[in-house]
């Protein structure tokens, strides 16, 4: 099985120790797989982002904002905490990276910093049984923070279908939210 990689980035000048530029990276979504639940705006339908649509839309992610809602349970496009400077498709994952406004939003940097890293999550999920995240009663795969994309100009193959297949879209941003609130539970975000 071969790995496919499509990548784009905005080259940011290196500024050592910049107080308002804290790096982040993570998985925004997956391609060619139905969402675990219906995202906001999909009228109760699960969605499937096709690889072709994602490849075409990757450039629209660059320079878009990363936002959050105070309860980390949805989107709030007026609370912009960072910017996406890199987006790529690795296998079936749409990965992103960029910068958080660390000086402006130290509480969000701290919250994301508490999130288990990708390798820690893999170890938690590798334990036999159904591991729980510390005291929350949530399976480790759903614990912590994830991400969700924001889009416009979506073309849905069949709006009567149970799963909406997205064949075209424009990314307009992304949100940080609790993984158990995300449409795709395999999303994640970490500092780095």
Region spans (language model):
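Short, surface-exposed beta-strand/loop "edge" segments at domain boundaries and coil↔beta transitions
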Residues: 23, 29-40, 56, 72-76, ...
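Short amphipathic beta-strand and strand-loop transition segments with alternating hydrophobic
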Residues: 7-17, 78-89, 155
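Residue microenvironments linked to proteolytic maturation
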Residues: 86-192
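Short secondary-structure capping micro-motifs at structural edges
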Residues: 69-72, 79-85, 134-136
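Short conserved beta-strand and strand-loop elements enriched in small hydrophobics
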Residues: 60-75, 147
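A broad, low-specificity signal marking well-ordered, structured residues that form hydrophobic/aromatic
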Residues: 22-26, 64-66, 94, 147, ...
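A structural detector for beta-sheet-dominated domains
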Residues: 6, 13, 31, 62, ...
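Polar/acidic, low-complexity leader/linker segments enriched in S/T/G and N/D
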Residues: 1-62
